[in-house]
């Protein structure tokens, strides 16, 4: 009899544990009660771990990683059968830059190759093949961001959020949506947009998670950050950040919905030449900000933009100097470097509370990382870095370096100490 009672209690305990795991599968890493950090992260808080290569399937087609790597997000529940090596979860990312199809890959244990030998790096494995979720084949030089979030209020499952645009986007196009994590049956929903000046250039190139405790306290639970920097400053003379929460406007919001938003960072567009020119310190029109992440570790945090920064003189023309009729025409600087640009979350608090204007926050630190990169061949090389993603629980920062491995990117890994 006692054995039967013990068995019943054991079964009840195991059942409750299974239900908890099931219920939490879309909500892990939410850290709902975690305190809001009060200190800044510094460049000395980062340790370089190494890098890894991406899968080779589909080469020479749009279903490959070649010329890709400009959107990335971390999925903590991915790759459940992966190696027990401390690198838990998976990554969703975009491939070939013509169509930005989405794939899911494993995260192998990175290797720090002292001689930057690609053959020493492990290779990720494909978990989900590339799928054409966004249908961007008609876009000229597309721009895309993606971000995973666990299920939010009113949702029955976690979502993969996306934003998209193109280099020249003069109409008020729709820019945002979401889909399911199963890429073969994505159930894409959208599209929506953010109604702000120059929204087609300042809202739709990167997405990142806002920590729940911060979002709940300062921006009414708007947990998704979105933004874009468009070279030449059409978007604003520096990166931008808008907090959004599409799930608060329907499950899903109807097609064409104007998303409610909260501006956290926005500088003056160069198109608004008749207004006061508020810009980021040391701004160059040649700057590139391909990704952004809200980093946190213990009592320290920072909003970090990942990209390529101009130094010295800046001009419109080609690498040799100003010109209007020349090859490689665009914005150039004397030197370009791959960097991480740090903003203080407390400055965003002031904006959210109406105590500062969205153009007032300024970066407090910059971290140059070219010494870790594999493909830098000239001081004016563009596209040093692609997108970024963050494993908040373990403190791993994943940063893409494009065009390294037969035109495929590799992924570098840093750990916040």
Could you tell me what each predicted segment is?
Residues 4, 17, 354:
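Functionally constrained cores in energy, signaling, and assembly domains
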Residues 5-13:
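Sec-dependent N-terminal signal peptides
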Residues 13-17, 78:
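N-terminal processing/targeting junctions
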Residues 16-36:
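Bacterial Sec-dependent N-terminal signal peptides
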Residues 31-417:
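Sequence/structural signature of beta-propeller domains
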